[in-house]
Amino acid sequence: MGEPIYRRVVVKLSGEYFAGPQSYGIDQSTIDRVAGDLIAARGLGVEIAVVVGGGNIFRGVEVSARGVSRPTGDTMGMLATVMNCLALGEALQRHGQKARTLSSFVMPQVCDLYTRAAAQQTLGEGGIALLAGGTGNPFFTTDTTAVLRAAEIGADAVLKATNVDGVYSADPKRDPKATRFERLTHSEALAGGYKVMDATAFALARETSLPIIVFSIAEPGSIGTVLGGAGRATVVAG
C-alpha cells in the first residue's frame, strides 16, 4: 500500500456484498474480510467512516412494488442498514478495532444517534464510524447518504465499493464491448446515466466538490490500494 492521498474518507459498502455467496442475509466470513480491509486501511492513518446498504436484508423499492408504500418500504430498508452496521461493528471490535454505530434513527438501546459531532469525535479518537439508518428519510438511497455524510464531516472523498472495478460505458457483465472510464467529471457521470450511483448522489457530490472513487471490493486489500491512489478504479471529480 502506498502513502494515502486522502486523510478522511467515507467508504460506501453494498449490503448485497455482505451476503457473500448467499443471496440473502449476512455471511460472517465476508464481514470479517471487509473488517480486516478496513482495519488495514485505518492503519495507514486514514480516518474512516462507513455507510452500508441494506439490500442483503431488505429492499424498500422492491417491496413497494408489492403493495407496501414507498415511505414504509424505505424505512424498513434503512433499518436493515442498522443490522449490517451492528454486524460489521462487532467484527471490527473482535479484531481489536474501536468502532461505533451511529444511526439517523433514535434507538438508544441499540446504538447512538448520528450527529456530525459524534461522528467526528469517533474519528478523532481513532475509531471507525459506522453511519447507519440512511438519511433517515424515504426516497434517498444509501449512496446519497454516503455523499451527504461525507460533506457533513469534511471527508476528502467517497470510496464507492462495488462488484466492478469502476464506471463502465455499459454493464460489463452483459456487454463485452463496455469500456471502463479512468476519470469522469460529476456532470459527465450525471449525463451518462451510469447506474453505479444514483443521480442525486452524483449531483450532491458535484455541489459539494466531493470526489467519488468507484472500485471493486472483491480484491482483498482494495480499500488500502485505492487510498494510495493505485489499483483499477474510476475517479469521478471536477
Swiss-Prot record:
Coiled-coil annotated residue ranges, if any: none
GO annotations of cellular component type: cytosol
Subcellular localization(s) per the UniProt record: Cytoplasm
Catalytic activity: UMP + ATP = UDP + ADP
Membrane-crossing residue ranges in chain numbering: none
Gene Ontology process terms (BP): 'de novo' CTP biosynthetic process; UDP biosynthetic process
The EC number(s) this enzyme carries: 2.7.4.22
GO molecular function: ATP binding; UMP kinase activity
Regulation: Inhibited by UTP.
Binding site for UMP: 54, 74, 135-142
UniProt enzyme class: transferase
Pathway where this protein functions: Pyrimidine metabolism; CTP biosynthesis via de novo pathway; UDP from UMP (UMPK route): step 1/1
Binding site for ATP: 12-15, 55, 59, 162-163, 168, 171
Pfam family, one: AA_kinase
Keyword Nucleotide-binding (UniProt): yes
Similarity comment text for this entry: Belongs to the UMP kinase family.
Function statement: Catalyzes the reversible phosphorylation of UMP to UDP.
Subunit structure: Homohexamer.
NCBIfam families in UniProt: pyrH_bact
Entry protein name: Uridylate kinase
Organism per entry: Rhodopseudomonas palustris (strain BisB5)
